[in-house]
Amino acid sequence: IAFDNIEADDNLKAVIISGVGRGFCAGADLSSGKDTFNPSFDTFGVKEDDFRRDAGGILTLRMYKFLKPIIFACNGPAVGVGASMQLAGDIRIASEDARFGFVFANRGIVPDACSSWFLPKIVGISKALELTFSGRIISSHEALDISLISSIHKSENLMNEAINITQELIDKSAPISIAITRQMLWRSYSQSDPYDAHVIESKAMDSRGASDDAKEGVNSFLEKRSAMFKNKITSDMPDFFPWWKESN
């Protein structure tokens, strides 16, 4: 619901997600003991046809379809779904105190939140397998080395840095251009041929090239001023969008 509301408000340009206190998210609450992962005790999963949908996957799939930048500012330990949910973000930064653990196999379960799709694309298949097989906790510095995160910051500076990064993403760019670009790049992961990307890029170039935003982008450059893009995500997306078959 939160992502729906943000997407419906043209005044909101991006999302920053962080934790409260010393940790980001420690994953599942293990207080139920041996019944922690029993489907009968899961109040968040959704039944669909012949299977029960993982709640983490429902969240990351909504993030995947989101039309605005998502930035994670990991302020502390992120374990289980606390780590896997961040993979659907566009940019992840972390504090020096952050830790990441894909500990699912250690608990006798498997990766959730579509992380078997996201993680190999971010860190590579071999590193993804190593992290999920072993479940070992990695530091923010190792996370940076494997491109799981983009940068490390002092805890007291983390949110300010996240805001600065976000402003760099959105301040000079047209919201609709960002929305289409986000979907083009994410969805190109599953395309088998660059021609598929060429088709969408061509349609998008034609649509955007004829838009008021494109005129404003050129005029603002020539006039050496900041652009004032007026096209809105809620009302001015191109006719060919979405170009993919919608899933739940």
Write out the residue ranges for each language-model feature:
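Conserved CoA-thioester-binding segment of acyl-CoA-metabolizing enzymes
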Residues: 1-20, 36, 239-248
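Short hydrophobic/charged patches on amphipathic alpha-helices used for structural packing
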Residues: 3-4, 60, 83, 206
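Generic structural signal for alpha-helix termini and adjacent loop/cap motifs
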Residues: 9, 36, 211-212, 224
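Crotonase-fold acyl-CoA enzyme core
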Residues: 61-176, 211, 215
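C-terminal long alpha-helix characteristic of the crotonase
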Residues: 5, 93-98, 149-200, 206-216, ...
